[in-house]
Amino acid sequence: EEILEDCKRHEAKKVHRYSIVTAGRALTGAEMEKALRAYRAMKKECKVELCASHGLLSQEDFNRLKEAGVGRYHANIETSRRNFPNICTTHTFEDKLEVIRRAQAAGLSVCSGGIIGMGETWEDRIDMAITLSELGIKSIPINILRPIPGTPLEHQAALSEDEILRTIAIFRYINPTAMVRLAAGRNSMEHSGEQAFRSGANAAITGDMLTTSGNRISEDQEMLAAMGFTL
């Protein structure tokens, strides 16, 4: 019920996509059933497009999500194939690619991007953008690392705004027809990342994220309207 009411609140603010995001390797058992019930309820009572992010699911689970009304699945590849083992040890880069292929086989569109500022090179960022292009991804979130105390990357130096903007421009150049989405970390940029929309970003994930707070919907709407964008 809480999820349904939250979805309705966001729909009233003209948000056109609503996503449930869970942590962990994969949502299974009773938790998956709970998520499916929530998706069915939202599909019945709301007009927003439904998105999901539940880890490394099986083909059967992707089929069930599709039947429950989910239209898009979120599965970040995080970084380049070369850099992935430096960031994640619980699963492989190929596991990520296989999950994307399963979601696509179930008839879901896929939202996939990554995190910048984790110590990767420019070559890693370019390779990540090329991989997403080869997968046919049309929704690419770019998250900016905000080091959190107690995590392995807590001492990672923050990216300059210029480097962030150049990275966004590269992703736009390699993926000219995709929605390049500003995601977590952009509220650390000047004016909530306003310049990023002039550098190639043409979408944003608004509201709170899994581990960090995000921008208020009203603030994003005002900023984008002032820049002349159609919402």
Task: Report residues per predicted region.
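Core AdoMet radical
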Residues: 1-6, 10-100, 109-113, 138-143
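Auxiliary Fe-S-binding modules of radical SAM enzymes
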Residues: 5, 133-231
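Conserved strand-turn element in the central/C-terminal portion of the radical SAM core barrel
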Residues: 18, 24-28, 99-123, 142-157, ...
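Conserved, mostly hydrophobic/aromatic
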Residues: 20, 75, 103, 132, ...
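Alpha-helix N-cap and loop-to-helix initiation/capping positions
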Residues: 30, 34, 88-95, 120-127, ...
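Short, hinge-like loop/turn segments at secondary-structure boundaries
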Residues: 37-38, 68-71, 91-93, 129-131, ...
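Anion (oxyanion) recognition and catalysis
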Residues: 43-44, 104, 225
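Catalytic cores of alpha/beta
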Residues: 57-67, 118-133, 187-199
